[in-house]
From Swiss-Prot:
The chain crosses the membrane at residues 36-56, 78-98, 107-127, 158-178. It comes from the Eukaryota. Residues 57-77, 128-157 are extracellular. Homodimer and heterodimers. GO terms for cellular component: plasma membrane. It is found in: Cell membrane. Residues 1-35, 99-106, 179-205 are cytoplasmic. NCBIfam families: A_tha_TIGR01569. This is CASP-like protein 2A1.
């Protein structure tokens, strides 16, 4: 009777209704994950655009002279990096929102591009942070005086733009983790061999 009961439970568990429910749950999870990833890719579009606009409009003229973001290579790099990041974020969000079957080539493409964009925007923020730090503190070793005491408005806008850039870095760090998971989850776990058995077989041969 216990064997009959086990067979009934197996038959019930493998019924078409429950199989259909399992497939529905799986498709629902994929849809919700796709929605979350799409939103995460849209957020950097707004962040990069705001950082870009703030830096583009960042210039100040006073009795000490005039200063613009274009006078410093680090800030020009920040502008270009934010522009590239905004464009890629928008395109990747559109592709992510499209319900397409996952393929290995697509997973590799998103993984590599997300990694490149993460380091690109991180480098832009780091280099700009160093420049604005020198603008605030100066460097006595090379007799550089601080510039922010004379161009306070310029430094404030620069700090705001850099801060927004680092928020973008956090978003792309999360996106890199997601794309890494989606890629490497497609690979099977490595097969573990019994080393002792292999040694014995080699010895007897």
């Amino acid at each position: 009777m216990m064997g009959d009961k086990g067979e009934k439970e197996c038959a019930t568990a493998s019924s078409p209704i429950e199989l259909g429910c399992g497939e529905g749950d799986e498709s629902g999870n994929k849809s919700s994950m796709r929605t979350v990833e799409t939103l995460l890719r849209l957020v950097p579009v707004a962040l990069c655009t705001v950082s870009l606009v703030v830096m583009l409009k960042n210039s100040q003229t006073n009795d000490f002279g005039s200063l613009s973001y274009s006078d410093l290579g680090a800030f020009r790099y920040l502008v270009h990096a934010n522009g590239i990041c905004a464009g890629y974020s928008l395109l990747s969000a559109i592709f992510t929102a499209m319900p397409r079957p996952p393929t290995m080539s697509r997973a590799w493409t998103f993984f590599l591009l997300d990694q490149v964009l993460t380091y690109l925007i991180l480098a832009a923020g780091a280099v700009s942070t160093e420049v604005v730090y020198l603008a605030y503190k100066g460097d006595e070793a090379v007799t550089w005086s601080d510039a922010c005491s004379s161009f306070g408005g310029f430094c404030q806008k620069t700090t705001a733009s850099i801060s927004i850039t680092f928020v973008t870095v956090l978003c792309y760090a999360v996106l890199s983790l997601i794309s890494s998971y989606k890629l490497f989850s497609k690979y099977d776990a490595p097969i573990c061999f019994n080393g002792k058995g292999i040694e014995i077989a080699a010895f007897h041969s």
